[in-house]
Amino acid sequence: MKKTFYHYMMKHRAALFSNEISNLAEAMYDDLSFPKQSEDYDEISSYLELSGMLESMSIFDEAWDLYIQDR
């Protein structure tokens, strides 16, 4: 069974050492409108761009690459 991107990112919450990916995971957790069931890069990328959640989309790209490697 595939994990959604949201589910994958939740393992990065409350990291011992805070970093950009753990901060993104916390922001996703706090955002009740985040598309939690999505596995689609374009849908999640568009959502993050429109929400202004990130200063740089390269943070999402890095997290997405880790997600794809883990699948």
Swiss-Prot record:
<protein>
    <recommendedName>
        <fullName>UPF0346 protein BA_2302/GBAA_2302/BAS2147</fullName>
    </recommendedName>
</protein>
<dbReference type="InterPro" id="IPR023089">
    <property type="entry name" value="YozE_SAM-like"/>
</dbReference>
<comment type="similarity">
    <text>Belongs to the UPF0346 family.</text>
</comment>
<dbReference type="InterPro" id="IPR036806">
    <property type="entry name" value="YozE_SAM-like_sf"/>
</dbReference>
<dbReference type="Pfam" id="PF06855">
    <property type="entry name" value="YozE_SAM_like"/>
</dbReference>
<dbReference type="InterPro" id="IPR010673">
    <property type="entry name" value="UPF0346"/>
</dbReference>
